[in-house]
Each structure stands twice: as C-alpha cells, then as structure tokens.
C-alpha cells in the first residue's frame, strides 16, 4: 500500500477498481525521491503526520502530460515526494492540518521563465536548505513534457543550462524579468543553433525543440564604433576614456597635440 507506479496505455479510457476503502496508511519513505499514492479519499499534504519532519516542503508533484505541483493526494493517482532521510509518514482520513500551507512561488521576487505551466526562477540567491524545495523529481518517461535547469532544479542564480523534453516541434516560453542582469548586461537565452534571445521586461518567444538551452548574463553589444567623452573633464591629473566596438577588432588610441604631434598612445591591441 502507498506505492505509486508509471502506467502507459495505448488508448484513453477508464476502469472501476473494487476493494476495501483505505482510511489510514503508513508509508515508508526512502531518502530522496519516492513514488507514492494516497487513501481512498482526497488528503492534503499538510494533514499528513510526519513525526520525523522528513518530507521536504514543496516537493509533492503529480503528473498531467508533465509534472505539476500538488498539495492534495487524489485517489488512484501517483505522486513524487522527496524526503530528507528515510522514515515513515502516516496518512489518516479526515485528519486536520498538521502544518501551515506555504507558498513557494517566487513570482514577483525573482526573474521567471514559464513553460507549459512550469515556472523556472533565476537571478536571486536562496539558502541551501530552501534550494531543496525547488528540486524536481526524476525525469518522466519519453513522450512526456519536461523542462528544468540542469541539476534537476527549477531555480538558478545566473548562468545555467535548461534541459527540455518535448514531444512537439516547438514550444512557447513566457518570461518576466524584474531583476536586471547588471550594468551594460542583459539576460540572454541561447539555443544550440547559436540563436540568441534577449530577455527584457515581459514577453513570449516560440522556439524549436532542442535538448538544451543556455541562460546567462551577457554584455550588451554596441551597434556602432564609439569613442566617448573623457571623464572627468577638465581633469588633474587623471581622466578616463571609454570606447565601444560592435565586434572584436584591433584598437589603437593615440593622443595628439594641437600641432598634430603624437603625445601618447593609450591603447594598441
């Protein structure tokens, strides 16, 4: 009792399962991910008796063409849940909540990419203990949809690979950027075909299905050759000069006096 399984059917349909209702169940969990099932009626994850506090908060996932976050175990369905260590939990029909509900959404607090209802967060740091609450179960079987950062997580600080399983040829990514990449930097999503998408504000992009994408901060590329005004000006004794290049090139910066004589060569690359 209390185990979950992957099942694959050639066609859609339904069946009736007869048996004795299960109103209480003790489930032994292994350390890390476990595939479990519930009782003969809906039960909240927050009403489960977890005397050893072994369940990692926020790690109950159901499946509907891809993983979906869950807080209710529905009869007849399987769920992934992650445990800090091995131990036992007890499910009881009609039990009251043992812990207060928690919202693990970082919408409005971090940058986000949303694909098929799955949110990936980036651009913020969280504690090592909280990171486990953003971990994801083992990848589903082929034919399902799945998106995650490498390392089986849905949160990243800056540069990260995005791994995708998609039975379709394309998919749409919605993005919401609220934390800048930094001065003269942009958040950029790159494909394996060297296509790059700059992520600013909110929007959507439709991309071809590939196994991996790269999300990272990149310097903003100038569109023209520019030599900026020195600063400060006037100065004594030091000043700074800045220049922009739209592509990698050899650069020479030379200072001449009013008579056209060379005074100094500042850059020669």
Each language-model region and where it sits:
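N-terminal exported-region signature
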Residues: 1-185, 191-195, 199, 259
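Extracellular Ig-like/FN3 beta-sandwich strand-entry sites
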Residues: 2, 76, 210-212, 248
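Residue-level recognition of strand-loop junctions within catalytic nucleotide-signaling folds
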Residues: 10, 84, 244-246, 267-268
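Surface-exposed coil/turn segments at beta-strand junctions on protein surfaces, enriched
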Residues: 72-74, 166-168, 200, 208, ...
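Short, compositionally biased serine/threonine- and acidic-rich segments at solvent-exposed termini, linkers
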Residues: 78, 190-222
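A generic structural signal for beta-strand entry/edge sites
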Residues: 159, 170, 204, 212, ...
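Glycine-centered coil/turn sites that cap beta-strands in beta-rich domains
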Residues: 217-231, 235-257, 265-266
């Amino acid at each position: 009792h209390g185990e979950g399984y992957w099942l694959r059917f050639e066609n859609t349909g339904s069946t009736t399962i007869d048996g004795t209702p299960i109103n209480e169940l003790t489930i032994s969990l292994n350390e890390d991910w476990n595939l479990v099932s519930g009782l003969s009626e809906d039960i909240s994850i927050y009403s489960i008796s977890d005397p050893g506090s072994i369940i990692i908060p926020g790690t109950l996932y159901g499946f509907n063409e891809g993983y979906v976050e869950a807080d209710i175990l529905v009869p007849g369905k399987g769920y992934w849940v992650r445990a800090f260590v091995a131990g036992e939990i007890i499910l009881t029909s009609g039990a009251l909540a043992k812990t207060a509900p928690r919202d693990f959404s970082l919408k409005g607090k971090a940058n986000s990419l949303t694909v098929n209802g799955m949110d990936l967060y980036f651009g913020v740091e969280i504690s090592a203990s909280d990171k486990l609450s953003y971990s994801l179960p083992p990848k589903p079987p082929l034919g399902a949809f799945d998106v995650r950062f490498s390392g089986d997580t849905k949160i990243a600080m800056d540069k990260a690979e995005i791994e995708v399983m998609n039975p379709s040829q394309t998919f749409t990514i919605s993005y919401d950027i609220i934390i800048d990449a930094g001065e003269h930097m942009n958040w950029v999503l790159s494909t394996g075909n060297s296509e790059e998408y700059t992520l600013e504000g909110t929007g959507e992009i439709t991309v071809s299905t590939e196994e991996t994408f790269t999300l990272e901060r990149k310097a903003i590329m100038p569109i023209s050759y520019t030599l900026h005004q020195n600063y400060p000006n006037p100065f004594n004794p030091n000043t700074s000069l800045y220049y922009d290049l739209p592509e990698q090139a050899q650069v020479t910066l030379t200072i001449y006096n009013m008579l056209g004589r060379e005074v100094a060569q500042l850059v020669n690359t």
